Amino acid sequence: MFSNSNIGLLLFITHTLSAITVGILLGLLARLKHKLKNNIFAHSYNSSTNELCTFNNLGSILSNAILESSKTIIMIGGFVVIFSVIISILGNSKILEIFSYLLYIPLKLLNIDLSFAKPIISGIIELTNGVLLVSSVTSKAISFNIIICAFLLGFGGISVLLQVLSITSKSDLSIKKYIYGKLLQGIIAAIYTYILINLIPMFFLNL
């Protein structure tokens, strides 16, 4: 994407740190809201052990696992293709450009080039195409490109959120909490990226 191993290492470090940070913050928040019962882990362990004891057909379990994983891979590929087509349609119809006007004021306040507006909207919709567009923008400092990419990689985009929703829809997991967590991860990843670029010489990429 940037053809620079230092940038790849930088994004890896910041996203690892941001994921850990979000995990710690959400864990602390959950402890504040709910008092954990002493026997909850024992109950979960016993129930899972009982379920494992009822599985007699290993071949059936493996075939079902392979089938479900294959379906998931096809589904993810389908989401990427569909959202790539959507971005192309929105771009050709100038609708994407209209949406990009919403970012003009925030970008001006942050002293970021307005040419990032359309790529950011694309990245919010679909991650892969968005980060490629952001990385290709010519700006006064490449650090802007990297920080924006860090945010988009942390957030994941609407396409990724819908992929997760399609997988977790049959569970009791809260998609709202996941969205808030991903948004928080994107913001924290961008902050960590800014800090590392300005504090560590090997990541000083403003030149």
Where are the regions a protein language model picked out?
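C-terminal transmembrane helix pair
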Residues: 1, 11, 15-24, 140-207
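Conserved, well-structured core segments that form the ligand-binding/active-site neighborhood
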Residues: 1-47
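Catalytic cores of large soluble enzymes that bind and process phosphate-bearing ligands
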Residues: 5, 9, 13, 54, ...
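Short, mixed-charge, low-aromatic patches
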Residues: 19, 23, 56-62, 118-122
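Transmembrane alpha-helical segments of multi-pass membrane transport proteins and ion-pumping complexes
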Residues: 19-31, 72, 76, 80, ...
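Transmembrane helix-loop junctions in multipass membrane proteins, especially transporters and channels
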Residues: 27-39, 92, 96, 138, ...
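Intrinsically disordered, low-complexity non-transmembrane regions of multi-pass membrane transporters
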Residues: 32-68, 207
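Transmembrane helical segments that form the transport core of multi-pass membrane transport proteins
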Residues: 62, 66-147
